[in-house]
Amino acid sequence: MKVETYLFGAVDVSPEKVITFPNGLVGFEQSKRYMLVHEEGPAEPSSFTLQSLDDPMLAFQIVDPVMLGFNYELALSDAENALLQSPSPEDVAVMQVLFRKEQDDKGSITPNLRAPLVINTKSRVGLQKVMETMRPNITLSNLSSSI
């Protein structure tokens, strides 16, 4: 299928590359189909673009929390497990959406720690896990030794 995007122009997307978020993402519930795009190169990509296939103007920068030194331990409800088609742990990718605070003139980018994306990499189905209270077990591993 050919998709027009504002970041990448016209892109051919094979159906097996589509990631479906049945409930959409918070604030963007109408967009349910996405593709992941990353810069080509010899190194592992540090971030990805999650491009909506339903809205060509909608794209998010996402990152593996491990790249930022975070390790999530998330408990999924029975409904979330069913939506993700009961994946085994090795088939799950947890990603964080990056955002820029509007009141920040420095243009700093922050990960959304309260609402990570959880994706079943085999079935290519995902959800946004919104945590009402911030109580995940997070391990920081990239701390500078000069602290």
From Swiss-Prot:
Its biological purpose: Acts as an anti-CsrA protein, binds CsrA and prevents it from repressing translation of its target genes, one of which is flagellin. Binds to flagellin and participates in the assembly of the flagellum.
Gene Ontology annotations of biological process type: bacterial-type flagellum assembly; regulation of translation
Lineage: Bacteria, Pseudomonadati, Pseudomonadota, Betaproteobacteria, Rhodocyclales
Protein name according to UniProt: Flagellar assembly factor FliW
Cellular component GO terms held in the UniProt record: cytoplasm
Subunit structure: Interacts with translational regulator CsrA and flagellin(s).
HAMAP family referenced in this protein's UniProt entry, alphabetically: FliW (MF_01185)
Location of the protein in the cell: Cytoplasm
